[in-house]
C-alpha cells in the first residue's frame, strides 16, 4: 500500500491510496467467505460453490462492495496515522481504479482539524464584576422562607378575593368566541398577584366571592409562543370554587428555631448572608473566567470548517433532547410549543456551536503550547468528585469505575481547568 497526499482548500486534504493487487485479491476472498452462503449456483449446494465459479456465474463485481470496504477499513486509518492527520468528519471516498488483475486505487477527501493561530492570551485585560449582598437581598430571601412556611386556610363564605389570596378556579378561554386548545382548567389554584396568568387576569378576580363567575378579558402578548394566540384578545369564563388566605408566620426567634438549626433570627440572617456571599463570589469567579477565555478565543485566528459547526449543533440538539426527555417531553412537542422546527432551532444554535468549537480548539492549542498535562493524581481526584454524584458508599471503587469508563473526558476536563487557571492568573483586572 502506498499513498499520496494533496492539500486542497483550507482544512481539506485529499489522499490517493493504492492497494496492491495481491492485497485486494485477499479482500475479495474475504468477501467471498463472508457472502458465499448467499449464492445459489446450479450443481452446487448453497454456499459450496468455489470462488472462480461464483466469479464466472455472477461476475466478480458481486464481491467488490465488501472487498472495497475491507480495503478502505484497513488502509485509510493507517494513512491517517502515518501523516498525523486529525479528521473532523468521515472521508469522501471516490474509486479511481477497480479492475481485476490491477491495483485497487481510491481517493479519500477529508476535512481536518484547523490550525489555530493564537493571539494574546496571557495578560488580557478583563473587567471583574462584584456582587455585594445587600440587606434587601437578605430580607427577600427571608421573605421567601416566610412564604414557604405560610399556613393556608379557607376563607369564610361571603369573603371576597384579595391580593395574596389563593383562588381555586375553573376557567375556559375563547379567542374570537371559539374555545382554544390548552385554554381550559378545573380546580386550578391561582395566587392572586403572582403574575402566573397573562396581562391583568388576576387583578380582575379581586372582589369576587365563592361560586361567583365572571368573564375576564385579556390580550395575549405578541410573543406568547403560539402563533394562533400571539397578540390576540381573549375572553376567559372564570368561576371561583374556593378562596384561601395565606397566614404568614411572624419573623422572630421562634420562626428561626422552627425553620433552621439556629436559635435567633439574627443568626438566620447571618447564615443567609454568608451563603449568598459565597454564591455571589462563585458567580463572579465564573463570569471572570468566561471573560478571560472569551478574550483568548477572540484574539485567536481560526478558520472553522462548516462540518465541525454542524457536528457541534448535532451534539447540542442531542443535549436538548436529553433534557426534554428528563422532563417527560420530546423534540416534536417542543417544536409545537415554541412554534419552531428543527431547522429554526439549528439556526438558533449555530452561533453558540461555532463558539463552542472555537473555544475547544483554542483551549487545546494553549494546553499544547504551555505543555499543560493532567497527573494521575489529578485524574483520580476528579473521578472521585464525579463518583460522589452517584454514591457515598465504596467511593474509591466507584471513582475507579468512573475513571476507567470516562478517562479521556476527565483528562480533558482537568486540563481545561488548569488552562483556565493559567489564563486567570495572568489576566489584568481593569475597572
Curated annotation (Swiss-Prot):
Primary localisation category: cytoplasm
Record-linked Gene3D superfamilies: 3.10.50.40, Trigger factor ribosome-binding domain (3.30.70.1050), Trigger factor, C-terminal domain (1.10.3120.10)
Enzyme Commission number, as recorded: 5.2.1.8
Ranges in coiled-coil conformation: none
Localization of this protein: Cytoplasm
Recorded GO MF terms: peptidyl-prolyl cis-trans isomerase activity; protein folding chaperone; ribosome binding
One biological process term in Gene Ontology: cell division
Keywords noted in UniProt: Cell cycle, Cell division, Chaperone, Cytoplasm, Isomerase, Rotamase
Domain PPIase FKBP-type: 164-249
UniProt KW Isomerase keyword: yes
Catalytic activity as recorded in UniProt: [protein]-peptidylproline (omega=180) = [protein]-peptidylproline (omega=0)
GO cellular component: cytoplasm
Annotated PROSITE patterns: FKBP_PPIASE (PS50059)
The keyword Isomerase is assigned to this record: yes
Written domain comment of the UniProt record: Consists of 3 domains; the N-terminus binds the ribosome, the middle domain has PPIase activity, while the C-terminus has intrinsic chaperone activity on its own.
Biological function: Involved in protein export. Acts as a chaperone by maintaining the newly synthesized protein in an open conformation. Functions as a peptidyl-prolyl cis-trans isomerase.
Similarity comment: Belongs to the FKBP-type PPIase family. Tig subfamily.
Stored NCBIfam families: tig (TIGR00115)
The protein, known as: Trigger factor
Source species of the chain: Clostridium acetobutylicum (strain ATCC 824 / DSM 792 / JCM 1419 / IAM 19013 / LMG 5710 / NBRC 13948 / NRRL B-527 / VKM B-1787 / 2291 / W)
Organism placement in taxonomy: Bacteria, Bacillati, Bacillota, Clostridia, Eubacteriales
Gene name of this polypeptide: tig
Amino acid at each position: 500500500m502506498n499513498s499520496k497526499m494533496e492539500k486542497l482548500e483550507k482544512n481539506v486534504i485529499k489522499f490517493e491510496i493504492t492497494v496492491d493487487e495481491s492485497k485486494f485479491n485477499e479482500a475479495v476472498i474475504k468477501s467471498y467467505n463472508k457472502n458465499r452462503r448467499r449464492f445459489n449456483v446450479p450443481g452446487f449446494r448453497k454456499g459450496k460453490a468455489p470462488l472462480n465459479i461464483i466469479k464466472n456465474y455472477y461476475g466478480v463485481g458481486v464481491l467488490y462492495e465488501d472487498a472495497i470496504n475491507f480495503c478502505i477499513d484497513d488502509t485509510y486509518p493507517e494513512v491517517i496515522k502515518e501523516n498525523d492527520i486529525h479528521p473532523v468528519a468521515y472521508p469522501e471516498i471516490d474509486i479511481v481504479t477497480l479492475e481485476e488483475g490491477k491495483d485497487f486505487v481510491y481517493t479519500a477527501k477529508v476535512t481536518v482539524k484547523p490550525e489555530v493561530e493564537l493571539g494574546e492570551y496571557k495578560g488580557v485585560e478583563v473587567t471583574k464584576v462584584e456582587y455585594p449582598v445587600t440587606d434587601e437581598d437578605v430580607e427577600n430571601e427571608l421573605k421567601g422562607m416566610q412564604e414557604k412556611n405560610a399556613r393556608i386556610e379557607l376563607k369564610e363564605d361571603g369573603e371576597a378575593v384579595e391580593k395574596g389570596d389563593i383562588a381555586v378556579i375553573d376557567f375556559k378561554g375563547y379567542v374570537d368566541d371559539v374555545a382554544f386548545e390548552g385554554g381550559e382548567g378545573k380546580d386550578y389554584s391561582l395566587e392572586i398577584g403572582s403574575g402566573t396568568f397573562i396581562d391583568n387576569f388576576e387583578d380582575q378576580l379581586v372582589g369576587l366571592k365563592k361560586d361567583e363567575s365572571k368573564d375576564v378579558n385579556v390580550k395575549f402578548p405578541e410573543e406568547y409562543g403560539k402563533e394562533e394566540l400571539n397578540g390576540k384578545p381573549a375572553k376567559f369564563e372564570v368561576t371561583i370554587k374556593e378562596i384561601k388566605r395565606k397566614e404568614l408566620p411572624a419573623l422572630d426567634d421562634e420562626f428561626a428555631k422552627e425553620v433552621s438549626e439556629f436559635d435567633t433570627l439574627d443568626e438566620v440572617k447571618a447564615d443567609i448572608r454568608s451563603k449568598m456571599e459565597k454564591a455571589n463570589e462563585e458567580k463572579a469567579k465564573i463570569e471572570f473566567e468566561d471573560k478571560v477565555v472569551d478574550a483568548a478565543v477572540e484574539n485567536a485566528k481560526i478558520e472553522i470548517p462548516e462540518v465541525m459547526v454542524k457536528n457541534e449543533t448535532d451534539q447540542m440538539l442531542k443535549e436538548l433532547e436529553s433534557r426534554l426527555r428528563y422532563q417527560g417531553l420530546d423534540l416534536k412537542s417542543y417544536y409545537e410549543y415554541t412554534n419552531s422546527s428543527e431547522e429554526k432551532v439549528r439556526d438558533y444554535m449555530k452561533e453558540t456551536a461555532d463558539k463552542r468549537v472555537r473555544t475547544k480548539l483554542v483551549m487545546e492549542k494553549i494546553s499544547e503550547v504551555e505543555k499543560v498535562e493532567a497527573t494521575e493524581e489529578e485524574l483520580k481526584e476528579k473521578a472521585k468528585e464525579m463518583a460522589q454524584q452517584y454514591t457515598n458508599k465504596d467511593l474509591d471503587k466507584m471513582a475507579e469505575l468512573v475513571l476507567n469508563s470516562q478517562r479521556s473526558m476527565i483528562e480533558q476536563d482537568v486540563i481545561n481547568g488548569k488552562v483556565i487557571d493559567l489564563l486567570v492568573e495572568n489576566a489584568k483586572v481593569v475597572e
